[in-house]
């Protein structure tokens, strides 16, 4: 990470620096989108991606605290990152995951924009999810935001498909059941059996990411987890 930061500062004279961290990170279009916006709005800033595996997350956060103005968080760090930042916005508390971190003089505050990023496009199309059945693939940080939004929208039935019925799945099931939603947990490869009975299917896994998922082998080339 230090090498990447040194190379970045040598290359750029930008006044503000932002990044996205994750593992894998090759799929992320965040640098393309953010840098395009910075250029269009004449903002003196640069945005880049940094590959950070789980074992390096704490060290990476410590370095970024003194190096960037803010950063985004993608798989598989959206939940674990909470341990290493100073404060949570109400959005992050509600979801239990963080995908955006602001840096105010070294104090890091976490936010969650996945909730609105998921539900707003659905609402903008006039789709009403109340009373509907939903199949959710995955049980990681993104899935937490999806479940929070689905609960608020009043769905009737939720099926969560994951590689294993782990503690993350059970936590999401409990969250939904507390809202009176009928729930079921299944293994990911059983999804086809249930998909036809659902009104909405949500993919909150790395499946489909460019250069990340090997369709022939049915596993992630990076061995990242959907947990």
Where do the protein language model's features map onto the residues?
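NAD(P)-binding Rossmann-fold cofactor-contacting core
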Residues: 155-179
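Rossmann-like adenosine-cofactor binding region
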Residues: 181-227
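Residues at the starts of beta-strands that form the adenosine-phosphate
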Residues: 17, 133, 156-158, 182
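C-terminal helix-to-coil terminal segments
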Residues: 1-6, 224-225
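Glycine-rich adenosine-cofactor-binding loop
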Residues: 22, 110-115, 122, 127, ...
């Amino acid at each position: 990470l230090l090498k990447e930061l040194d190379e970045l500062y040598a290359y750029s004279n930008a006044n503000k620096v932002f990044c996205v961290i994750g593992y894998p990170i090759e799929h992320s279009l965040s640098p393309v989108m953010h840098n395009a916006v910075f250029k269009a709005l004449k903002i003196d800033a640069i945005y880049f991606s940094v590959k950070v595996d789980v074992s390096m997350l704490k060290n990476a956060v410590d370095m970024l605290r003194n190096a960037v103005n803010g950063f985004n968080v993608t798989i598989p760090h959206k939940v674990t990152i909470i341990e290493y930042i100073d404060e949570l916005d109400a959005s992050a508390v509600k979801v239990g995951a963080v995908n955006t971190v602001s840096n105010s003089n070294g104090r890091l505050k976490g936010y969650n924009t996945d909730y609105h990023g998921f539900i707003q496009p659905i609402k903008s199309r006039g789709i009403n999810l109340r009373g509907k059945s939903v199949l959710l693939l995955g049980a990681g940080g993104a899935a937490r935001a999806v479940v929070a939004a689905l609960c608020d929208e009043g769905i009737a039935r939720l099926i969560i498909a994951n590689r294993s019925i782990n503690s993350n799945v059970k936590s999401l099931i409990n969250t939904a059941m507390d809202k009176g939603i009928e729930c079921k947990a299944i293994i990911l490869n059983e999804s086809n059996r249930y998909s036809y009975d659902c009104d909405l299917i949500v993919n909150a896994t790395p499946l489909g990411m460019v250069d990340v998922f090997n369709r022939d082998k049915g596993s992630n080339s990076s061995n990242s987890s959907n947990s």
